[in-house]
């Protein structure tokens, strides 16, 4: 029997998720149908699309911009949230709470939300061989992308964490909110800086902003150094990575994170683990 999945967003035509998950299905030996689903940008439309999909037998859905917070609110009022979703304040993976289904709760009232973005980032760094345990890490950006990766990084054993943002007050607010949301984070001291004031030696620096996609550059000082630089964006030459590459750092964009978070979603839905390295090679061969 074919298992049905969707990715919901606006815009959505650019999404690589159908190709990625179709490959996962082939690797796992499962008959799946994964489609893009456009949705008008409002909560009522999102709820209607989700309810129709799961009422019709859908197995799982991915959620992308601008609906991750709406999905969070929807699941919080229904089937629940994972710890990572609670801390991130956003949901990128929808599935059904089997315990509630077993009690006779209708599928649309058993929606459960997870967030696999941060773990996808951590898993990609681990596949690259980047040392996270004991690492000194800095994140540039204090928006939703940064929020979603803090807990997985701490769970991976990093030693210190600094968060920098053009407006330092936004970084301070983020740290306060994260510390309130998670005892694991509350036990970890996080330093905050204005991006232009971030300096010193770090093992890993992560760009969690989209500035590079617009051709802008971050106000990085020459006194800021790292061994590894990671940009969560992908798909073009990124000034952030160029800045650190010429200074001798190993660099990576976020394409591996995209595949990693997708693999985790697929495993949540189907119970099948994906060989991400094999899948990445296959996808790279298809795109070249």
Swiss-Prot record:
Gene3D superfamilies: Leucine Dehydrogenase, chain A, domain 1, NAD(P)-binding Rossmann-like Domain. GO terms for molecular function: NADP binding; shikimate 3-dehydrogenase (NADP+) activity. Keywords: Amino-acid biosynthesis, Aromatic amino acid biosynthesis, NADP, Oxidoreductase. It catalyses: shikimate + NADP(+) = 3-dehydroshikimate + NADPH + H(+). It comes from the Bacteria. GO terms for biological process: amino acid biosynthetic process; aromatic amino acid family biosynthetic process; chorismate biosynthetic process; shikimate metabolic process. It is an enzyme of class 1 (oxidoreductase). Disulfide bonds: none annotated. NADP(+) binds at residues 83, 141-145, 165-170, 232, 254. One of its GO terms (cellular component) is cytosol. Shikimate binds at residues 15-17, 64, 92, 117, 234. The active site is at residue 68. InterPro entries: Aminoacid_DH-like_N_sf, NAD(P)-bd_dom_sf, SDH_C, Shikimate_DH, Shikimate_DH-bd_N, Shikimate_DH_fam, Shikm_DH/Glu-tRNA_Rdtase. Involved in the biosynthesis of the chorismate, which leads to the biosynthesis of aromatic amino acids. Catalyzes the reversible NADPH linked reduction of 3-dehydroshikimate (DHSA) to yield shikimate (SA). Homodimer. This is Shikimate dehydrogenase (NADP(+)). The gene is aroE.
